[in-house]
Curated annotation (Swiss-Prot):
It comes from Olivierus martensii. Potassium channels inhibitor. The keyword Secreted applies. GO terms for molecular function: potassium channel regulator activity; toxin activity. This is Potassium channel toxin alpha-KTx 14.x. Residues 1-23 form the signal peptide.
Length: 54
């Protein structure tokens, strides 16, 4: 059973790494462009209260 959970954890980490490279699958709220620089890869602008991560 521990091996099963270890495999699930590895898959979850890998899928999150892929999402980070391709852009987040969810909306990231921001107040300034500096917030997006910390939360998204690259340096996306803050538009209408959300980061343009994709």
């Amino acid at each position: 059973m521990k091996i099963f959970f270890a495999i699930l954890l590895i898959l979850a980490v890998c899928s999150m790494a892929i999402w980070t490279v391709n852009g987040t699958p969810f909306e990231v709220r921001c107040a300034t462009d500096a917030d997006c620089a910390r939360k998204c890869p690259g340096n996306p602008p803050c538009r209408n209260g959300f980061c343009a991560c994709t």
